[in-house]
Amino acid sequence: MTLKFEGYGYLITGSTSGIGQGIAKELLENGANVVINYAHNEDNANETRELFKQYENQTLFIKADVSNENDVKDMFDKISKRFGRLDGLVNNAVYDKIFSIEDLSVEEYRKELDVNVVGRWLCSKYAIPLLKESKRPRIINIASRLGTKPIDDSVAYCTSEAATMMLTQCCALELTPKYGIKVNTVSPSMTLTPFARKSYTEEEIKETANRNPSKRLGEVKDTVNAVLFLLSDKADYINGENLNVNGGILLK
């Protein structure tokens, strides 16, 4: 099965590291034009520029906070001027901090909801004028298995990921009949990104992997493959769904 992306245009939010960077890399290697978005980390952005140096003509780097409406509007203006088209939006930007319910502040709760829910809605909203002109328009929201199965000390994150799944369904219900835009969620479990490798010990990683029926943790490529399939013409009849990429961890 061949997935064709040459000449298509995509925005991947939060794409200077981890899963977002992996999605961008795969699309670039397949001939797509890709907008790389980041909010603050200039070091990651510069490393990604160097990594994608050979794709300079296919990339556009935009620093924008997805929870800030003016930033989002400006980002889509830049995309329109540079590429003049957009065929897919991958809402990958995320904010996640660990707090118990008692220790969680209003400011932190709002920050997680602003980035993880409001940000995904804002980007979807302002992507519509470009997406509706595409012959294969797609929106993919990257959520988490924690949107359906909560854990301790993550009330804000779990709530935001559950809300994202409903956002996906609402957008699919409204945007598909109007503009043909297909909207889906991809929900990975713990994934071995560079950040995860720094955040957990080898023993913690091994222990978590052993709890999974597949006896391993997710790799970036697992989520990348799911996203590229949903962006492709092979997934035209999949809409409003949540694709779990977790090795079967929700079965336990």
PLM feature segments, named:
Residues S100-I101, S105-L113, E204, T208:
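Substrate-binding pocket helix/loop in short-chain dehydrogenase/reductase
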Residues P177-K182, I238-G240:
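Short, small/polar-rich loop/turn modules that mediate ligand/substrate recognition or access, typified
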Residues K149, K206, L228, N239-K252:
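Short C-terminal tail/terminal secondary-structure segment
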Residues S144:
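Residue(s) in the substrate-gating loop at a strand-loop-helix junction
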